[in-house]
Amino acid sequence: MKQIKKAIIPAAGLGTRFLPATKAMPKEMLPILDKPTIQYIVEEASRAGIEDIIIVTGKHKRAIEDHFDNQKELEMVLEEKGKDDLLEKVQYSTDLANIFYVRQKEQKGLGHAIHTARQFIGNEPFAVLLGDDIVESETPAIKQLMNVYEETGHSVIGVQEVPESVTHRYGIIDPLEKEGRRYEVKQFVEKPKQGTAPSNLAIMGRYILTPEIFDYLETQKEGAGNEIQLTDAIERMNSDIPVYAYDFDGDRYDVGEKLGFVKTTIEYALKDPKMKDELIKFIKELGF
């Protein structure tokens, strides 16, 4: 069985929920404290043993490439000024993995974005990590899925429970047999109408996929939002080849919408010993 050494991170979206901030800056570069959100995703992949990452980009995304590139002039300035802690952080971001880029020329959905990276992946199993979800866990979320793949040899989709009131916002699984945290899946449903979801187990932006998925994406018709939906292709593949779901362990932070982004920033700040006490004091002073 081939080991998983490659990952795709889709980052071509327009980030309309964060306009006007994202008019000229990629949504993925919005910072949680002192790191852009996409770095948290790359760090997760790196911790899981992923060696090669392809980031699917689009227009106005050059800042992502610059962030993960070497900046020798900046490093020289930091070294000359004795700012070793900042120098270490800057160098760390460039050494996480081998990072490559491909452009998604048209915004045609997540499935289309994944298919854009087919040539890079070749005939290998691979990981997909979406940038809207930061996951904090002792074992990286994507590594938990990799472990299930090594047990089964089949694709594995990361899920977590959500309130029934929001199931219409997610891809949802219709589970069959359960073994520990792993599910066999009867059906994958992309954003079911409110009140019709077969469960409250939602797909949460982490996937291990076998290369067969590209054949299904190649022929996938447009679905929700008139886009090529990855969930629809996974559902078709599941009819022919088993696809498992795994309820991964970890705290998920939704940074794909403004309130979740603010909550994440506050929680991360409260974890920072340099900020915690002053932030708590400030919040108390607000009097809420």
UniProtKB/Swiss-Prot annotation:
An individual GO BP term: enterobacterial common antigen biosynthetic process
The keyword Nucleotidyltransferase belongs to this UniProt entry's keyword annotation: yes
CDD domains (alphabetical): UGPase_prokaryotic
Reaction equation(s) it catalyzes: alpha-D-glucose 1-phosphate + UTP + H(+) = UDP-alpha-D-glucose + diphosphate
Pfam families: NTP_transferase
First-tier enzyme category under EC: transferase
EC number(s) on file: 2.7.7.9
Function: Catalyzes the formation of UDP-glucose from glucose-1-phosphate and UTP. This is an intermediate step in the biosynthesis of diglucosyl-diacylglycerol (Glc2-DAG), i.e. a glycolipid found in the membrane, which is also used as a membrane anchor for lipoteichoic acid (LTA).
Designated name of the protein: UTP--glucose-1-phosphate uridylyltransferase
Organismal lineage: Bacteria, Bacillati, Bacillota, Bacilli, Bacillales
Gene: gtaB
